[in-house]
């Protein structure tokens, strides 16, 4: 355990404005929602990191128009109202877990779309079974694996994520549940979680 860091009290009150860094996790969630929305969405306070750049690159690969200004931490995304412009694409998710899972559910919305997804060596070891099994059970997509089953790389054949009832085991990663929830507003049936209510925990700042 690191040694305690002593904090000296300030001798007088300060009047300053601080700019806190954005969140990688929240930025990638907002990017998916912006792509699903109809029209332009302007994000402020976005975090530009490897993971968020991977998400932006993936959206552009799928035909979405984006404008990024890292100096002002702003991103503009032109959403297509639940439509994905390109029916075929090769997406590299690197080692970005949020991009990997959120994009997989997102792509399942596009009935007839065929997408090849891969990641780096570490991503190929990360769990994807929970999300993929849920999408198959919802008849939203079929998957062809080019390595170990339920792992990257794979080809996603989208059948249209229409919603319905599914059981999600989010113990491996909460991103599995987030991925389904983010895409669910664009389903025709909606989605329902089996089990207790979803608890959202906001850490104290």
Predicted regions: what they are:
Residues 1-205:
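Structural preference for solvent-exposed beta-strand-turn elements
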